[in-house]
Amino acid sequence: MFDRLPALRIFLAESRLGWVPFWLEEADYWYERHRHWAARLLDLKPLAQRPSDYVRQHIYFSVQHVERVAIELRQHVGVAHIMFATDFPHIECDWPNTRPFAERLFAGLPPDDAFSIAAGNTLEFFGLGDTPMGRRVRSAAPR
């Protein structure tokens, strides 16, 4: 699908992120292990890339306050593909304590990574960077 639609981007909201690095490794392993017989016996065409490459190029994930491990594993997915979420207005949302939760989540991160995950990636994904709110948020970005 991604070879036919190279500009396709998918955002998995409320999916969490901590499981993704393990899943990427597993997907590549099992694809490599079975692709030869699947092509031969089932006439399935081989992928142009590894499954993990498609995910890293096309899939975006949300991360919430309790996912410090996911933040520490961010390079496995790519910082540009991670967006902070509060899950408002659901019962498990961070509000009204979003700021302290976010501060704990992003503690020790390079400021550029923290800004990208907290706001920048969302502005980019949804095309909000040139809106009045987007410009205001970007003005707070680390320099």
Locations of the language-model features?
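Aromatic-lined glycan-binding groove of carbohydrate-active enzymes
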Residues: R4-S52, R56
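Mid-to-C-terminal alpha-helical segments outside catalytic/metal-binding sites
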Residues: L8, G18-W19, A38-L41, L47, ...
